[in-house]
Amino acid sequence: MRRTHYCGELNAKNIGEKVYLSGWVHRIRHHGGLIFIDLRDRSGIVQLVFDPSISKESYDIADTVGNEWVISVEGKVRKRPEGMENPKIPTGEIEIEVEKIKIENTAKPLPFNLWTNKEIDEIVRLKYRYLDLRRDKMQSNIIFRHNFILSIRNFLAKNGFIEIETPYLIVSTPEGARDFIIPSRLQPGKFYALPQSPQLFKQILMVAGFDRYFQIARCFRDEDLRADRQPEFTQLDMEMSFIEVEDVFTIIEELFKTVLKEVMNIEINTPFPRLSYEDAMNTYGSDKPDLRYDLKIVDVTNILKDLPLEFIRSTIEKDGVIKGIVLKNIVPSRREWSIIENKVRELKGKGIMWFTYADGELKSSISKYLDENIKDKLIKNLNLKSGDSFFCIAGTWKDVVKILGILRLEVAELFNMEKKEGLFFLWITDFPLFEYDEEERRIVAEHHPFTSPKDEDIPLLDTNPLKVKAKCYDLVLNGTELGSGSIRIHKKEIQEKVFNILGITPEDAKKKFGFLLEAFEYGAPPHGGIALGIDRIIAILTNSNSLREVIAFPKTQSGTCLLTGAPSEVDPKQLEEVHIKVVYPEEKKEED
């Protein structure tokens, strides 16, 4: 039998037609001397009817099949009897009167119920991924992903972008996360790395004159995993020549506007709002704020700085700050204040000062230190109304905004605050070019070493590099960073200066990035771009809790594939061919 239709595409217009269908047995029912089978393929479900008066042979075969068996059938489309229609499915008006059936394959009893509404153990789901992927939600996610990427490709092609593949086997440049490395058989002792991003190659493509590049790129990072990380992931990688930051914003905003309308029929407003890095940290305590909550951080340093409290005096002497969050129409209980207090201490804060305002009176955990003048200033500056509360903490700017950024979301959850519905995009701009890493005790790149400093800050590279702002930007959606981009350095002397500040010696720079530096000497145009995480975008748009829900074959949090058993040991001969000897850590030796 040769399939003529997909199951889910049949409807009343097909009544009277002979069809050939193939798929999986979704459900079996015996009723009134007939057998009903719901046949499923990726397009949906259609009802088959086996009537012994029409084909006794087909009826007898149908009586032997089980759930998830694979069958093919030949039959005629007919209207369902009146009152037996199913408006919940697209094929609910019709059914197939089966004349012939062929069993293509049987199925063992399933290790889990594919169609339960209960949560299924994820370990079992990942081990039997081929079964898990049959489930409606998983099929829907993967097909949505395909449609989303297809729409991206079409949009970019129409806007003059060329899709170009860059190498997977590259030179290792371990400046960010760890590289996955691959030994070379032909050159003993040398290694390739899998790309963490196509960054250098896309810049080279701009030097080569391709002007507008994109790629749906596979990237690899050997790092500790969380729910929002995978060792291999997919990003939309883009680069453009002769552009400024505004050009990147415009094309990305238009891309999302077009793709979301085409794939989801969602209208979004553009341009997206923008916040500088400093404003985002001061207002939300995060460089990826979730704008679905209205909670904002407020500064009360000037109001409380003169209080006769040792920890405040110490904070002010060290140029610290006092910041907090107003809780509108909320008066926390003692237990709730304790929860907030404990969270602050868990985050290495010094505790909280709390205030509640009711019936014209401001009460506080530090009431005895507050005179009427300070109380009035707090009420006025914080716009407190009866039934409002406020808490604040003191410390260094960096510590305070970080703690409050986390607390902002914890408090919203604690008090079940209303979260606005919709997609809230936001550009974060004006990042510092460098930051000081306390653990490594050195200056490191805030994003990566190829980001251009702002033109007006270039002189600061020689005098005060930590004050230099970058032509850099992040795109945030509902509190998740979708990706980063920047205008790149395109002049050799500035790139060398940045390398020097980062402690990359001329010898190391030549060894790792010599091809890029040399390319800059052959007419490199101004250029910039962005990389957006496809997996994260799809997870948000499908309301998925984990990236594993939107990737066909993901890894676990320990980086393993439960389906195939990767990573695995290899044949000693394979190791010998690439001149590798495995030296196990002590704990592995003890296990053996």
Curated annotation (Swiss-Prot):
- GO CC terms for this protein? cytoplasm
Q: What is its EC number?
A: 6.1.1.23
- Location relative to the cell: Cytoplasm
Q: Which residues bind ATP per the record?
A: 221-223, 230, 481, 533-536
Keyword entries, A-Z: Aminoacyl-tRNA synthetase, ATP-binding, Cytoplasm, Ligase, Nucleotide-binding, Protein biosynthesis
Substrates-to-products reaction catalysed: tRNA(Asx) + L-aspartate + ATP = L-aspartyl-tRNA(Asx) + AMP + diphosphate
**Record site feature (Important for tRNA non-discrimination), residues:** 31, 83
An example Gene Ontology molecular-function term: nucleic acid binding
Which sites bind L-aspartate? 175, 221, 447, 488
Q: Which PROSITE patterns match?
A: AA_TRNA_LIGASE_II
Question: One of this protein's GO BP terms?
Answer: aspartyl-tRNA aminoacylation
Physiological role: Aspartyl-tRNA synthetase with relaxed tRNA specificity since it is able to aspartylate not only its cognate tRNA(Asp) but also tRNA(Asn). Reaction proceeds in two steps: L-aspartate is first activated by ATP to form Asp-AMP and then transferred to the acceptor end of tRNA(Asp/Asn).
**Assembly and oligomerization:** Homodimer.
Protein name per its UniProtKB record:
Aspartate--tRNA(Asp/Asn) ligase
